[in-house]
Every structure is written in structure tokens, then in C-alpha cells.
């Protein structure tokens, strides 16, 4: 089994419902088990700032799927929940990013792991580190909390405390 960390985000319509449905669908993936989910945080939009605030969270899973197959599954979940890829950093019903896939490193057109922007985004690192405070970034094994310490966290607020139902 491979431990996988995901970031989930949404800023359209019933944001909390999209996160919940994404978690439920992730928990039902073949050869995959949802291990933990973070609290939900509300954050200002990143990249393209003239849009609604996001809800963001992280989750931890273990899977026997390959990284490529796992990516296909997450993209299918996004599509089933109405995700339309029309604008970079635009509004979305759900965004599921693979942050870490075990200790593996991928740099292909389709898949970049560790996620290339995760160390620049407090809205990713805060929920991720809630799940695993001592997490390190492969391949350099620098603590992710050290990246977070250098980031502005002022626009991130707790929306809903951690839940364990899955």
C-alpha cells in the first residue's frame, strides 16, 4: 500500500457538500482506504483573486493503485461533481490535487508529484500538516512545516473542525 495525501478545494455553490461528496467517493475507490481528513479551512482565492472564497482541506489515504490510475480516478471524481477546466485557477466545484504519493516523485505532463505549488500555498500546508505534522517533502526531505513558517497565513480561517466520519 502507498500512503497518499490529497488537497481538496471548492468555491462554487454548496462548497461543504462538494467536499463531503468528494470524500465519500474517494473512500469508495477500489483498493483504496480513506485514513484521515483534516479540518476545513476558508481561504481567499489564490492565483485568480476576483472570485468567491474557497473551502480547502486535506485527506490521507492508502492505495494499491498506481499513481497514474489514482490520478485518473481523482479526475473522474472531479468530472462527476461537475468540474469544468476552462480557466487556470478559476472557480471550480471541486479540485482534487495529489500532493504526495508515498515517497515517489513524478514529473510528467499529466502528473507532477510532489505537487509543484504545495510549498507556496498555506491553504494546502495547514490542513496537510494537521494530518501529519512531521511530514517531509521528497526527495529533499525538508519538513513541510518549515515551508509553512515562511508563508502568510492571515487569510485562512477555520470553517469546520476535523471530522472522523468516513
UniProtKB/Swiss-Prot annotation:
It is an enzyme of class 2 (transferase). Pfam families: HPPK. The keyword ATP-binding applies. It catalyses: 6-hydroxymethyl-7,8-dihydropterin + ATP = (7,8-dihydropterin-6-yl)methyl diphosphate + AMP + H(+). Pathway: Cofactor biosynthesis; tetrahydrofolate biosynthesis; 2-amino-4-hydroxy-6-hydroxymethyl-7,8-dihydropteridine diphosphate from 7,8-dihydroneopterin triphosphate: step 4/4. It comes from the Bacteria. Its EC number is 2.7.6.3. InterPro entries: Hppk, Hppk_sf. Belongs to the HPPK family. This is 2-amino-4-hydroxy-6-hydroxymethyldihydropteridine pyrophosphokinase. It comes from Streptococcus pyogenes serotype M18 (strain MGAS8232). The lineage of its organism: Bacteria, Bacillati, Bacillota, Bacilli, Lactobacillales.
